[in-house]
């Protein structure tokens, strides 16, 4: 993905003969040293991708190194990125991924300078380089590694200067957070107001339209948080039951962690409702009216209520962060793990175990939602991480519209962006201790579903990769802020004095010089039409009916239970509750009896032939038609090679995603193999060389 925009240059002394884009550059360097780029080469190469506001801070000739790689070129530092331009390289316009030679400053996770065999300095923002480096290693947060070696001689000062430029650029980037919704150059070509490709859920109309799409007739849009005075981490609007007044919503939300009370996440067509909320604020002292309002919101008009303890059997944030760090270290090109021990090391990261846990938990919740008409409430203390992950996975398993390209983007916007997932904190851009790649974990889970059910998803692996890469690309505020309130405040949409919120895509007043702030869904401003076309999965079958996977035919699976049946789902167990709220009588919160919810012994496909051990009054409960139940045992969980091994192109062969262009590439590769093997055919078989069967028999 290509990006750029406006920014500010840094207070770094310019190099002599510093090349400007399209202007004069350094002269060629005579002698045996590596030739320096000419002004035309450097200027034209950068001008093809640079946008107004990007400035070259420093550059140095070098060689990109790696397994079987020794590529001469130029290392360039700008106020937005670090890029390596190979000699004679031209930017390809049809690549669906970001250039392997470009690293956004915000994407650099680790910077190391090397001199000799043992002298290594870890360079943090603001560090002082203690020696002239012979090599520079940039470790990307997206599993890439840029290793550049510098030649000795007159180039040593340039190597020092480009390294210091990177250090200072990263420092100023982290201090002032210069990425303030960079305005892309193509925006200037758009006249008038620009309609967002995906509803950003910043207006009352957006929420009302989405509510109608889901058919949630018993729900309405609450405006109680329109000024962000109930919960700053929530959006200004959300769905609550029709019969609950906004005054009751305000009082009820005060008894939940960070004011994140129960609200609708998704309405199942069969009648069930999936809710999410934060943990109960035990220290509060609600009155009877407040407790009644909380219970009414949790029940959502249903007689059956199931509280799901989201974090049970799920990894902690620290576990996810540690697993991701181990995975990134394992997948780097310079990993020291022997090839015969690589799979064991991969298992030791536990990343795939955590993917498995998420899919298993989402499958359990999906059965709870579809088996009977009820209210299923996802409860997590902060309500900003795993509630969004599990809610999104449940909708992917149950809602065909969520598996479309438009639907998936809307799902992420609603359950992650508008719901206040702390992207900036979790993705490690603030240096906080709460770093954890929860959203990349969700993308891995979505990729697993795409591999297991390729005909069910309209989007392709290339789209998931583009979204994965967009996490740390500083052209929008979508993933660079923690809450909708922060995005609105930073972009000038929210007036802290008048408490007036202006939607991001509203038409500015006449004479206003405010820039148009983009969302991550404005793909056409960063990608060509050819690239966007690869976001679609050619194997998607919108008419595909998954009912054939289930042998049982059910006329009506969604039936009500007895009045006031309350349950807690934790660790695969349904436990009856005497009450929903913990403030009345905490000693009688849990009853002693419980019913086990069995898991499949060998494969999740066997769940279609099992009866789930739900409470007896619910009767026999076979799986409903249309429910996608992913496999999560053993080799059913696969390794996302195209994402995590992108820094090792030698292992990417044969891992093409399912796109038309990928099939063409595979065909070209097979034709090349045939051409290589054709000379090996014996002379007496030359007359038969046009027969494909003869050629294939020679190959085998």
UniProtKB/Swiss-Prot annotation:
Membrane-crossing residue ranges in chain numbering: none
Highest rank taxon of the organism: Eukaryota
A Pfam cross-reference name: 3-PAP
Coiled coil: none
Entry GO terms, CC: cytoplasm
Region (Disordered): 1-39
Domain Myotubularin phosphatase: 201-644
Family: Belongs to the protein-tyrosine phosphatase family. Non-receptor class myotubularin subfamily.
PANTHER family per record: MYOTUBULARIN-RELATED, MYOTUBULARIN-RELATED PROTEIN 11
Name of the protein in its database record: Myotubularin-related protein 11
Recorded name of the encoding gene: Mtmr11
